[in-house]
Amino acid sequence: MSGKEVEGVVSPADQQQPAVPEVTDITLEAARKQKIHNLKLKTACLSNEEYVQDLHVSEWSETQKQKLQAAHEKAHELLASVEGGTKWSLTEAYDIKKLMRVCGLEMSVRELYKPEDKPQFMEIVALKKTMNELKQHHNKTRTVSFTGMIDNAIAKLEKIEDELRRSQLDASEMAQVPVAALKNIEDTMNVAVVQTALLGNEEQIKAQLAAVEKANEIRNVAIADGEMAIAEEQYYIKAQLLEHLVELVADKFRIIGQTEDENKSFSKIHEVQKKSFQESASIKDAKRRLKQHCEDDLRNLHDAIQKADLEDAEAMKRFATQKEKSERFIHENLDKQDEAWRRIQELERVLQRLGTERFEEVKRRIEENDREEKRKVEYQQFLDVCGQHKKLLELSVYNCDLALRCMGMLEEIVAEGCSAVKSRHDKTNDELSDLRLQVHQEYLEAFRRLYKTLGQLVYKKEKRLEEIDRNIRTTHIQLEFAIETFDPNAKLHSDKKKDLYKLRAQVEEELEMLKDKMAQALEMFGPTEDALNQAGIDFVHPAEEVESGNMDRRSKMVEYRAHLAKQEEVKIAAEREELKRSKMLQSQQYRGRTMPQITQ
């Protein structure tokens, strides 16, 4: 330290800086009293020295010599009192700004953690509460996938809370790191299980299938009894039921799509983890920088204290040397005074000069003692300020280490949470893919039944239309014969012909309606057909089965006509030949493809 700092002399700029401790009225009053006490001690000592000088110029007798000896003894006691009783209370403290300037410190008190600082960890407690709420989530099917991760997170959060209670850290910022990951975990647990969502749909499908089977039974009984009107009505009922069945199966795609859309948002969980790790890295870097600055300041403080200790030791050594030298000087002075008394007559001037030298030496020694006491006070104050700041720096290093440990545990929580979400997301996608393929197969069976039913109705309506056309031609011929012969039944034939035309229009309208339904059902089957082909699943297209069934029915009808009308053998043989060629063409067209037996 410089002489200016030892003597307590500071610049006006330094005087404007806040002192540690702060100068108060009590401190100033104590300093004033101490100064008065010091002044009294010095005045008493110097007055005695002046008295000694007066004795040198007064009467020179043995009595005077004895008085002088007594004065010397008193002077020795007073000098010891001055050296032992002089104390200094500086009115200006050794403040932290001067310490930072002298020691080259970077961290100010404002930037450091302090013992009176209270830890702020309520956000961590809130995170623990959130994890406990997730553990009690109502969606138990989803909760099972996250139980292990949640238990680990709660244990780590409790450990973080215990660490923070022993620190001065504000955990508000670090508590925000896992918030995004926890939000994704909660959203994942809120996604409904697709199997549960499909339960209602499955029940409706079972009810529709039961209704279809009942319609089949009624139709078969009606056909066996020859009640073709009832059989036709049951065909329409079955078609309507199958249409609704197809709609129910198709609705599964909507439910699966909703679940898939809800699950799709979690595919970017790696971005949430990346962002959380970036926030964590930012906090850790800040704490590392603070720790590094504090450690650098601790090293600088340690070096400054060592330097101050060396300077203090040297100053004390110098003071002790000077004091020893002064003691020798005073003893020598006394010896010389004794010698002067023996030679008092001729050495008067010498005695007076020596008295003056003694007075000056005592005065210098008192001033030197003042400077030494001031230096000791400044040195002790320097050590006190260094000690206080050193504690703050060490406390800040401890808090930085604790913050780094806490952030490490929070990163583990984020990583485990994100891994659990990703695992659940991948598993859900696999389940949805398998379920979608299963629904496509189910849709194929429902479409096959609907399409075959509509195909049978179309076939029968076409045959019905052909029969009506034959009846119209027959009625027309009968009408012509009746007109030719003025037969009174001509009116009946004419009315019958009109009724047949009306019936034909009605049947033709129904036929068009059925064909439209077949076309619409075939168009809706397109996505399922593509999905099954992409999955590599072989199946016979229901359109092919309808064509094959129509061929079989035509063959059976031809055989029936062969038995009923032997006279039409030539015509029947020709139709058989046509059917044979059609079957051959069909077998060549679908050669190599399996056609499983379909149960109607």
Curated annotation (Swiss-Prot):
Q: Name one Pfam family in it.
A: Flagellar_rod
Show the GO cellular component annotation of the record: cytoplasm; cytoskeleton; motile cilium
Further information: Coded by two tandemly repeated genes with identical ORF: PFRA and PFRB.
The UniProt record lists the keyword 4Fe-4S: no
State where the protein is found: Cell projection, Cilium, Flagellum; Cytoplasm, Cytoskeleton
Query: What's the main place this protein lives?
Result: other
**Subunit and interaction comment:** Heterodimer of a 69 kDa and a 73 kDa protein.
Name by which UniProt lists this protein: 69 kDa paraflagellar rod protein
Q: Name one GO molecular function term.
A: calmodulin binding
